[in-house]
Amino acid sequence: MQDITVRHVRVLDDFKLDLTFSDGKRKVYDMKPQIWGPAFKPMEGNMRFFRKAFLWMGTVAWPENIDIAPEELYANGVENE
């Protein structure tokens, strides 16, 4: 299996991401269950910070060195036509 990367990200309301992957699939990923603990502290309840999401090295990242593995996004995202 080839490595899956994120090619496009669009921030949705309620801490969700609309993602397009390197294999062409589109999925929506709900970040709410991930936003806890020190790694994600800056975005806890903070949509303004969450909206700063950007593509970085094939995945989604935020300022303050926050990112999430593309494999997690792909495996647990819900397919979006």
Predicted regions and their residues:
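Motif-centric detector for short Cys/His coordination patterns
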Residues: M1-E81
